[in-house]
Amino acid sequence: GMTAEEIEKYINQIAFSSAEEFLEKYKDDKAAIIGHFGLGFYSSFMVSKKVEIVTKSYKEGAVPMKWSCDGSPEYTLEETEKADRGTDIILYIDDENRDFLNKDKINGLLTKYCKFLPVPIAFGKKQEWKDGKYVDTAEDNVINDVLPAWVRKPADLKDEDYKKFYRDL
């Protein structure tokens, strides 16, 4: 999670320094902005009419904060309620991008782009076949391998590990 000061530093200062010139430069080709420094998070505005960050730092006495922006250089930053430390990013998807809310589309994108990230990425719950249909279990459905073959010692790998890695590519 972040403090209000960290939000100001990492979200606002980096984001909005030269933001107006940046937006003017890419106004006709939104897709051209992907990959530019600091725009991983800011690409969320390509599909959203509004983005909120609800966050609480691990630091002693941290106050939960909510940052909200509609994609313009204007934003709000206010105290909020959040029991646990960490950060939630909430996207309010615009009408023309509602297909990104489709479960299969999300799963496909996460699998394609997050398959080998070093932290677990959970999407939904694992399912099991029960009474003629699939039902969710209590276990998170982790879509990535946090210890892929290339980070493990060759002596620790079995033939099946290599085959799984090849299939995952």
Q: Where are the regions a protein language model picked out?
A:
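GHKL/Bergerat-fold ATPase module in large chromosome/replication-associated machines
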Residues: I33, V51-E74, D95-N97, D104-L169
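GHKL (Bergerat-fold) ATPase N-terminal catalytic module, capturing the glycine-rich phosphate-binding loop
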Residues: G1-D95, D99-F100, G108, K115
